[in-house]
Regions:
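Extracellular/virion structural assembly segments
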Residues: 1-216
Length: 216
């Protein structure tokens, strides 16, 4: 793990998932906005001067191998549970109940879920606004939920923060879901800082790691 180790040891993480948009004012005074789809996740990660060089030489080698050309799968909160509060699931279902949900369809800004097999007659919200959701079985792209979603015993429609991204060779119908800290991103480095060895036996990075989600 290269980028994942950086995430796990971050002193701060900036998550930028704003839409890429341009705005112009026409000669008639009308404001027009064009949005580029899909929007992507950008992570700016700083690491304090605390990692020990002698026990992290393999990390340095892995970061040099990845550089800005090779992608890595990362999570926030699974590898380092101390970060789980960032992505933690907020809804009312148990992990076992989440595992009983399957996907019916996913198009545009919605994911439709089949909840008929969910046991225990749960009540309340299946998702809270801001929850993370991702299809399972190696689907690449996570989403956030844009409104509270109340549980229904048959089907629920989950509004998501960006248009659903098709993945070559991936069948949506019948898949399960991942939520909370179980979601992952595939990223490459836009900026991979150099490092210095400082007394005693510590690594100092020259700046932030800037990681961008890879859309294939």
């Amino acid at each position: 793990m290269g980028f994942q180790t950086i995430i796990n040891n971050a002193s701060d993480i900036t998550i930028d998932r704003r839409k890429a948009a341009s705005t112009v004012i026409t000669r008639s005074g009308h404001l027009r906005t064009a949005e580029r789809l899909p929007s992507v996740y950008l992570f700016n990660v700083n690491v304090a001067d605390g990692l020990t060089y002698s026990t992290n030489r393999s990390l340095i080698e892995e970061l040099d191998r990845l550089d800005r050309t090779i992608e890595e799968e990362i999570n926030i909160g699974t590898s380092n549970t101390g970060l789980a509060y960032i992505t933690q699931y907020q809804g009312n279902l148990t992990p076992a109940q989440i595992n009983q949900i399957t996907v019916t369809s996913a198009t545009g800004g919605n994911i439709v879920l089949n909840t008929t097999s969910v046991s225990g007659s749960p009540t309340g919200d299946i998702f809270k606004k801001g929850d993370y959701i991702q299809l399972d079985t190696n689907y690449r792209y996570p989403y956030t939920v844009t409104a509270d979603v109340t549980f229904s015993g048959s089907s629920v429609t989950v509004p998501i923060n960006r248009g659903f991204i098709s993945q070559t060779g991936y069948t949506v119908s019948g898949k399960g879901i991942e939520v909370g800290s179980d979601v992952t991103w595939r990223v490459k480095a836009l900026q991979n800082p150099t490092y210095s060895i400082i007394p005693y036996d510590r690594i100092s990075f020259s700046g932030a790691f800037q990681l961008v989600e890879v859309i294939t």
